Design a protein with these regions (language model features):
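Short, well-formed alpha-helical segments that are part of the catalytic scaffolds
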Residues: 13-34, 55-56
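A conserved acidic beta->alpha catalytic loop
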Residues: 14, 43-55
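Short beta-strand/loop segment that forms part of the nucleotide-sugar
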Residues: 33-48, 71-74
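Acidic donor-binding/catalytic loop of UDP-sugar-dependent glycosyltransferases
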Residues: 52, 98-99, 105-121
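Conserved donor nucleotide-binding strand/loop of the catalytic core
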Residues: 54-96
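Acidic donor-binding loop at a coil-to-helix junction in glycosyltransferase catalytic cores
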Residues: 195-201
Length: 261
């Protein structure tokens, strides 16, 4: 069986952190019931929060021995938050890194009941040390034209059927990324850069020759908001796509700002 560390960075996510953690715990319970998980820890980091995120996380995890909530006002980037949480979890669990998996998600994301189990099964079946899944939006919050543009961006990064079975898409989401701990440590973990720590980690694994699965079969549901918490995160990416369409609210706001008064 496998040890699992689930990493959940959270910044002012009081409205969504409860659903995120309930989903993570249910998925861990299901994986345990199927004999896939021996021990686990859920590492939540309340990063520079000014709302009730920390309190709500503690309330959801009360009575769950695997639940741990840390308060962090020092880390400069979400990459640093993810990395430090991963290393805390590994230190807490102990045991060989080759038998421990790090699963990363976000505090505005809902994972399914099979999430943990599917990752571990697919990793074993495909003989890989990292699994990059997909993230579906709960609701598009931009314009109709922006929604079409986003769909086109998604489709452009999907690989055709019948190609490399390990490389089914070119997307990377910190909300749905798993890495075996020995491989994670081998490449230095999540970078502490301003953004793009998920892509950088996957690129480092590939460059080091570690086998990686980019699968369409494992997906989570994440917020479709256009204003997020992390610089360079998904919300900023969505807003940029929406802003490029001529009839979007973002484009209208930009035109208004550029209009002389």
């Amino acid at each position: 069986m496998t040890r699992v560390v689930v990493v959940v960075p959270a910044r002012d996510e009081e409205a969504t952190i409860g659903a995120t953690l309930r989903g993570v715990c249910a998925s861990l319970d299901a994986a345990r019931a199927h004999g896939l998980v021996e021990d686990a820890v859920v590492e939540v980091t309340a990063h520079r929060c000014v709302d009730a995120t920390e309190a709500r996380a503690r309330a959801v995890l009360r009575g769950r021995p695997e639940g741990r909530v840390a308060r962090d006002h020092a880390a400069a980037t979400v990459g640093q938050v993810r990395d430090e949480a991963a290393r805390r979890g590994l230190a807490s669990l102990g045991g060989p890194p080759s038998r421990t998996w790090l699963l990363s998600t976000d505090a505005d994301t809902r994972v399914g009941l099979r999430w943990v189990g599917d990752i571990l099964r697919e990793a074993d079946r495909r003989s890989v040390v990292a699994v990059a899944g997909l993230a579906r939006l709960d609701r598009w919050q931009g314009s109709a034209a922006g929604a079409d543009a986003y769909s086109a961006v998604l489709a452009a990064k999907m690989r055709t059927e019948g190609g490399d079975a390990l490389h089914q898409h070119d997307h990377v989401y910190g909300a749905n990324l798993a890495v075996r701990a020995d491989a994670y440590l081998d490449v230095g973990g999540f970078s502490h850069t301003r953004h793009g720590e998920d892509q950088a980690l996957l690129d480092a694994l590939v460059a080091a020759g570690h086998p990686v699965l980019r699968t369409r079969a494992i997906a989570v549901t994440t917020s479709g908001r256009l204003r997020g918490r992390a610089a360079g995160g998904l919300a900023e990416h969505l807003a940029r796509i929406d802003g490029l369409t001529p009839h979007s609210p973002a484009a209208a706001a930009r035109r208004a700002a550029d209009t002389p008064r």
